[in-house]
């Protein structure tokens, strides 16, 4: 009898779904033809018209997918209600304790990666100016490239910093089509050697990695001192970063410098890691493009980083292997926090995975959904916090570009994203660019 009822319910669900799609197909066949798209020449004269058309098409696709999803969800809910009568009650697992974070006196070195920028002085001056303790935060400058002027600048700090030099300055044998990427190969070699010195030779339990073209915020050390215990105790975390990829002035809430997030995207640009992580990564360290390698699923393993609302580092180095394009287009606009936040006196337990997932997802999916064009034109300002939904790679990229956030993806993960959600400020209100609540994971083919 039970099998007959189950089969009947599934059959009726299938009939409803097929019938709905048949009606939908009939609707599309019989509705009046839409107006013609603008000609290529017209679009060329009016780029804004093309943007509106792309957004309109993406929103139409989103709306149709949402209707289909709603019908399937109704079928699932009715089936679940029926099955619930036959389900044996289960005991919920015990909740994790919410333990307030306390500051740790552990010694955390600042590893400065240097090469041929004599402007490393600007980086070191700020680090030394804001450093609360030379004993707790020793500064170790690892220099590659053999650039003598840079070496003299580092040496001028005497015992205030420790100067180590990467000994292998030879070119690296690469494939002919990768000769133009020689710089990226040398950077990966330098990182491997420098991190090996920190963890294998000096035996530090953790380190903050800083490039020589970064300027730090007044609470840079406070931030890492407070988040270190979280990183050490929460296995779902693998780094703490000082960087917000969408941290431009107009895209952050300047009134909340204390705000921190979890992110699935590895940000770099001033980041804390543990010795245990280096022991995991060192045997398979890549020959080049180490940061994108870190963002692959095989390395990330579902783990997250902590990142701030307002960046605690700012890059001033236009010169580099990327020839300045990314700096001119994006990096130079990132806001550096100037207000000291006493993070070690705050309860940061809300960043632990169980609490964060519960509260953050409730906040995002409790926010009213608004079409991207209405967000762009600042309609319904009274809503304050809103959600813009995407369901495909193309709709994410279209909506991200329309709202001014970074639209690139690494192994399916958006910059600053957590569970597919990118949170930012737009024209004074909080916006969450988010997938449906039924999101189950990243698609690595979204690149």
From Swiss-Prot:
Side of membrane Lumenal, spans: 30-447
Listed name of the protein: Alpha-1,3-mannosyl-glycoprotein 2-beta-N-acetylglucosaminyltransferase
Binding site for substrate: 117, 144, 190, 212, 322
GO terms assigned for molecular function: acetylglucosaminyltransferase activity; alpha-1,3-mannosylglycoprotein 2-beta-N-acetylglucosaminyltransferase activity; manganese ion binding
Cofactor requirement: Mn(2+)
UniProt xrefs under InterPro entries: Glyco_trans_13, Glycosyltransferase_13, Nucleotide-diphossugar_trans
Manner of cofactor binding, per the entry note: The cofactor is mostly bound to the substrate.
Biological-process GO terms, alphabetical: in utero embryonic development; protein N-linked glycosylation via asparagine; UDP-N-acetylglucosamine catabolic process
Record-annotated active site: 291
Transmembrane segments: 7-29
GO cellular component: Golgi membrane; perinuclear region of cytoplasm
Amino acids binding Mn(2+): 213
Main location: Golgi
Enzymatic class: transferase
Membrane topology, as annotated: Single-pass type II membrane protein
Localisation per UniProt entry: Golgi apparatus membrane; Cytoplasm, Perinuclear region
Cytoplasmic side: 1-6
Catalytic activity entry: N(4)-(alpha-D-Man-(1->3)-[alpha-D-Man-(1->3)-[alpha-D-Man-(1->6)]-alpha-D-Man-(1->6)]-beta-D-Man-(1->4)-beta-D-GlcNAc-(1->4)-beta-D-GlcNAc)-L-asparaginyl-[protein] (N-glucan mannose isomer 5A1,2) + UDP-N-acetyl-alpha-D-glucosamine = N(4)-{beta-D-GlcNAc-(1->2)-alpha-D-Man-(1->3)-[alpha-D-Man-(1->3)-[alpha-D-Man-(1->6)]-alpha-D-Man-(1->6)]-beta-D-Man-(1->4)-beta-D-GlcNAc-(1->4)-beta-D-GlcNAc}-L-asparaginyl-[protein] + UDP + H(+)
